[in-house]
Amino acid sequence: MQNNTTGMDTKSLKNCGQPKAVCTHCKHSPPCPQPGCVTKRPPVPPRLYLPPPVPIRQPNTKDIDNVEFKYLTRYEQHVIRMLRLCNMYQNLEK
């Protein structure tokens, strides 16, 4: 603590127990002696949330044999799968 006080006696300069941001009466030394009081430090930027990467589903080998298969709508792909299950797809190709 400094001995050359400007207009205040040393009793009023003692730590009053208030946090530094609240107290205007006493002059805290820069490292605040009170635990848990407000200190002046640059604000930490908030972390941006990065969603986890979505795993890309690899097409089956039977999906690859038809090159245009991935350009069809989901319903058309479903119909083709159902026809393959019924073993009718090979008959329709002939």
From Swiss-Prot:
Q: What highest taxon heads this organism's lineage?
A: Viruses
S-S bonds? none
The UniProt keywords, alphabetically, are: Host cytoplasm, Host-virus interaction, Modulation of host cell apoptosis by virus
- What triggers production of this protein? Its expression is regulated by host RBM38, probably via RBM38-dependent splicing of the viral pre-mRNA.
**Cellular compartments annotated:** Host cytoplasm
Provide GO CC annotations from the record: host cell cytoplasm
Q: Which GO BP terms, alphabetically?
A: symbiont-mediated perturbation of host apoptosis
Binding partners and assembly: Interacts with host GRB2; this interaction alters host cell environment by modulating host signaling pathways.
Q: What does this protein do?
A: Enhances viral DNA replication and virion release. Mechansitically, optimizes viral DNA replication by interacting with host GRB2 to inhibit the negative effect of ERK signaling on B19 viral replication. Plays a role in viral infectivity. Induces apoptosis of primary erythroid progenitor cells.
Q: Tell me what this protein is called.
A: Host-modulation protein 11K
